[in-house]
Amino acid sequence: MRDIPNSALILGLAGLVPFFWGVATSYDPVLHNLSLTWLSERYTGSSVNLIYGTIILAFMSGVLWGFSANVSDKRRPIGLILSVLPALWAFFTFNGPFINPFISLIVGFLGVFAIDVRFYYWQLTPKWWLTLRSILTFCLLYTSPSPRDRIRS
């Protein structure tokens, strides 16, 4: 963890705040009601995790695209194809009738991590990348929404 640049670690951890907010507003009745009153249902409970999770999957597609675009050998086309999969996964599965969006989110994060591992072994990422992504992915899975909010209004 010492090799991760401070800015990358701080910003990565800051990106987890909405996920922890989703968990907090799922379990704490006071935060739940405050969030409903001052924000909206979209920023409360598992809704925030699903919405923000979709954004993160698309964001990670862009990051992976950038890694792939920097090489000029046979890894580039495969990397570019792999890099768009998380965004396409989010688009086609989150609102479809075939898979629960909560399960889709978890599968999407695991898929991104698998691509991260592949890119790391292809040496497309910085040396510290997989350590950071391991920490963030663990936290994402830990805060993954359940199909039911814990608190009912």
Question: For each predicted feature, which ranges?
Answer:
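Interfacial loop at the N-terminal end of multi-pass membrane proteins
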Residues: 2-8, 13, 17-53, 73
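Short juxtamembrane and helix-loop transition motifs at transmembrane-helix boundaries
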Residues: 40-45, 61-73, 123-124
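Alpha-helical transmembrane segments and their membrane-interface exit regions
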Residues: 108-118
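Interfacial loop-to-transmembrane junctions
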Residues: 122-139
